[in-house]
Design a protein with these regions (language model features):
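Bacterial N-terminal signal peptides
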Residues: 6-14
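Bacterial Sec signal peptide processing site at the extreme N-terminus
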Residues: 15-31
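C-terminal subdomain of the subtilisin-like protease fold in secreted/lumenal serine endopeptidases
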Residues: 17, 23, 332-334, 338-341, ...
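Short acidic, glycine-rich surface-loop motifs adjacent to enzyme active sites
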Residues: 35-44, 154-176, 328-351, 371
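Mature extracellular/periplasmic domains of secretome proteins
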Residues: 65-73, 276-279, 300-303, 318-340, ...
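Subtilisin-like serine protease catalytic core
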Residues: 66-78, 86-320, 396-400, 422-426, ...
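Active-site glycine-centered loops adjacent to acidic/histidine catalytic or metal-binding residues
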Residues: 83, 373, 450
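Extracellular S/T/G-rich loop segment that most often corresponds to the catalytic His/Ser-adjacent loop
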Residues: 251, 366, 389-467, 471, ...
């Protein structure tokens, strides 16, 4: 008999009229972990699976709904998503978008007198702006050419442009190979449309066909679709043409002063943004949180009783501190109970505005779930600085801020994603963030990786807890996410050094978010106020 190590003792405890009965999910179940490659279905929904039941180290979401929630309806929870804009017309998000009932659509009147005209689903703080500089380039513009500060920024800027040009060339080569391989396979099969299964049964009779098949398998193994390659190509081009272009000014079209926090009469109510394709990131994030649960063909969200408040404040480039601070305040003032912030940058000239907004959210009991970042770096005090953060001179200034790193679907030494930032002080917990399937604009779906995907997974779990335990405070929800999480594999690779380390050296909890455990844990606790 295999020894099962439980996270905490079995609990049968009720909270109000809700009763959750079950054993917390297990960990270190190495003999039962799935060893074969995940099926196509499992790849799409691995983050919702359970280590004990499915041999896949997800967040035990499906198990929680089946064994604990069992059709019970909690309260709807407003989840604000501060991001790049969202395709609110995507079928997956139908019924999941927040509606401001106090505002009359399209009458050009601020009916609820909250300072925002026709804000039916949120607010677009960027107006028609799309591309933007990196913050380092904006700071460089303020320095005197030839000064030490200017030259330091210039050295970094030119280095980044060089790297992006190399990246652009590599992606162009892959896309060219894609088309060549596709043409060879189509000619061999004698058909325009084919499946990977049809490709796999081939025994190549020519070297060119063998190369084409190998390349197709490479693309499939890395979940690289044509549409994803085109997105990566556009991102590289945008980095060269806008992000690191010192002559580019993306803010001019907005019409405000981005360095005056009191200049807040700007933006518009178009939360999609000027182009749907620009809402790729935000749509993917929202799908992770709130796509319909009754769906095996498209996507399944963590909590489809979420009401998504869309706040477009993150351009293609670095966000402005003013936009983020005002977006947080908007979310708080208009009823959000969870705010997802899947973005970050290395410089924050007006960070105090954002810190004041974090404190504002804390006073009003709003939980903020933040992506740790994708540099594979230590973000603890004394190491790499990233913003937004609740770390001020090594001190945590608020209790309602959760920073989330990313893990993948492997329950072994490689569980922590190689790109994920980490830190035993400034990263609180991990969540699934590697190759997450979700919706993207124009009724499509895609796999994406990043702590940007980990944060909404954690936000979804937080929203479920807020739904069924509405009396719990934001700091208590944070404690629940951290304490009830499933411990990571006993030793994992440090993303920066590659050394095997204890998970406790990579985050404060050493755990990944787990809904099944969190429901039981929340039932069990007599929290201190």
């Amino acid at each position: 008999m295999k020894k099962l190590i439980y996270i905490f003792s079995p609990l049968v405890i009720s909270c109000s009229s809700i009763k959750f009965v079950g054993n917390p999910t297990i960990t270190h179940l190495t003999d039962y972990v799935k060893k074969e490659v995940l099926s196509e279905y499992e790849k799409k929904f691995w983050h919702l699976k359970d280590l004990a039941k499915d041999s896949i180290p997800g967040m035990s979401v499906d198990r929680a709904y089946k064994e604990l929630i069992k059709g019970q309806k909690g309260e709807a929870v407003i989840v604000a998503v501060i991001d790049s804009g969202v395709d609110i017309e995507h079928p997956e998000l139908k019924g999941a978008i927040w509606v401001n009932e106090d505002e009359i659509p399209n009458n050009l009147v601020d009916d609820d007198q909250n300072g925002y005209v026709d804000d039916i689903h949120g607010w677009n703080f960027l107006g028609d702006a799309e591309l933007e500089n990196m913050e380092s380039v904006r700071l460089q513009k303020k320095e005197i050419p030839g000064s030490k500060a200017f030259e330091k920024f210039e050295k970094d800027r030119l280095k980044n442009i060089k790297n992006k040009k190399k990246e652009l060339s590599d992606i162009e080569d892959i896309i060219e190979q894609y088309h060549e391989s596709d043409s060879i396979i189509k000619a061999t099969l004698g058909k325009e449309n084919y499946t990977l299964d049809e490709v796999e049964i081939f025994s190549p009779k020519t070297f060119s066909l063998m190369e084409a098949l190998i390349f197709k398998r490479f693309l499939n193994d890395n979940l690289l679709t044509k549409s994803k390659l085109e997105v990566y190509l556009q991102e590289a081009q945008n980095s060269i043409n806008a992000h690191y272009n010192i002559d580019f000014n993306g803010r001019a079209v907005v019409g405000d002063d981005p360095y005056d926090i009191n200049d807040h009469k700007y933006g518009n109510a178009n939360v999609i943004g000027p182009k749907k394709k620009g809402a790729n990131h935000g749509t993917h994030v929202c799908g992770i949180i709130a796509s319909s649960r009754n769906n095996d063909n498209g996507n399944r969200g963590v909590f489809d009783n979420s009401k998504l408040m869309v706040l477009r404040a993150v351009p293609d480039g670095d966000e402005y501190d003013k936009d983020i601070a005002l977006a947080i305040r908007y979310a708080v003032d208009n009823g959000a109970k969870v705010i997802n912030t899947s973005f970050g940058k290395g410089y924050s000239p007006n960070k105090y505005w954002v810190w004041d907004a974090l404190k504002y959210a804390e006073k009003r009991d709003v939980l903020i779930v933040n992506a740790a970042g994708n540099s594979g770096a230590n973000i603890d005090p004394g190491y790499k600085k990233t913003y937004i953060t609740d770390d001020v001179d090594g001190e945590e200034i608020v209790s309602n801020f959760v920073t989330v790193g990313a893990v993948g679907s492997s329950y072994n030494n490689e569980q922590v994603a190689s790109f994920s930032n980490f830190g035993s002080i400034n990263v609180d917990v991990f969540a699934p963030g590697s190759e997450i399937w979700s919706c993207v604009p124009q009724e499509k779906y895609e796999f994406y990786s990043g702590t940007s995907m980990a944060a909404p997974n954690a936000s979804g779990v937080a929203a479920v807890i807020r739904s069924f335990f509405p009396k719990l405070k934001a700091h208590q929800i944070k404690k629940t996410l951290m304490d009830s999480g499933m411990p990571l594999y006993q030793e994992v690779e440090n993303p920066e050094s590659g050394e095997l380390v204890s998970p406790k050296t990579l985050s404060k909890s050493g755990k990944m978010v787990n809904l099944y455990n969190a429901l039981i844990y929340a039932s069990s606790k007599s929290y201190k106020k």
